């Protein structure tokens, strides 16, 4: 944290811009959820839940400080997604735990961000064995659910590079149910927005 403060202070003193690599703002699952929210079909939002879970029950001993846990390692991305949508919350509560190996920093967390009547829940666990939604959003007029995570990282691990056929391929859809202006219940399969981590640099260019 002190190093980050030093960097931002240095940038401000020299009139420069410094930014972390917030690539998760350009996950396909997040961009799709964002588009649904911005469509207004859900009405006034009351709750959004974000999960980044997997099943890895064994954790080798790897002691470290809080900066080595999941809250600082992954939460900086999933919390940033929420903040990019709604800004700074009115108040926050959180629960950090180490469940697989007590010698290690936190591997499980839940943060709750409150914006008036809207509550945003951000969770990560390595002890979730069933398929659980990546995003769940509820509003006065409807609900949206998206299973499955962005596949760009999976493609990169398989040596499929950006621009190549099949990069980030994902044929899943989101499920949207809402009440339209005629009072009718509408069900929609929402196609995925295209994820693109390269847009981080486009956004930085626009800022500069």
Residues covered by each model-derived region:
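C-terminal glycine/acidic-rich active-site capping loop/insertion
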Residues: 139-208
């Amino acid at each position: 944290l002190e190093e980050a403060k030093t960097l931002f202070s240095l940038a401000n003193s020299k009139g420069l811009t410094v930014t972390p690599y917030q690539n998760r703002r350009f996950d396909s699952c997040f961009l799709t959820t964002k588009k649904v929210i911005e469509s207004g079909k859900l009405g006034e939002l009351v709750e959004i839940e974000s999960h980044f879970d997997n099943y890895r029950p064994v954790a080798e001993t790897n002691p470290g400080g809080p900066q080595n846990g999941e809250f600082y390692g992954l939460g900086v991305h999933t919390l940033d997604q929420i903040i990019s949508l709604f800004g700074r919350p009115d108040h926050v509560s959180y629960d950090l735990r180490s469940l697989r190996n007590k010698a290690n920093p936190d591997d499980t967390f839940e943060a709750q961000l409150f914006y008036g009547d809207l509550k945003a829940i951000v969770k990560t666990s390595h002890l979730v064995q069933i398929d659980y939604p990546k995003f769940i959003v509820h509003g006065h007029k409807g609900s949206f659910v998206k299973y499955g995570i962005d596949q760009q990282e999976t493609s990169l691990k398989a040596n499929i590079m950006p621009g190549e056929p099949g990069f980030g391929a994902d044929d899943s859809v989101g499920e949207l149910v809402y009440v339209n202006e005629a009072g009718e219940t509408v069900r929609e399969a929402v196609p995925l927005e295209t994820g693109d981590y390269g847009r981080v640099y486009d956004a930085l260019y626009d800022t500069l």
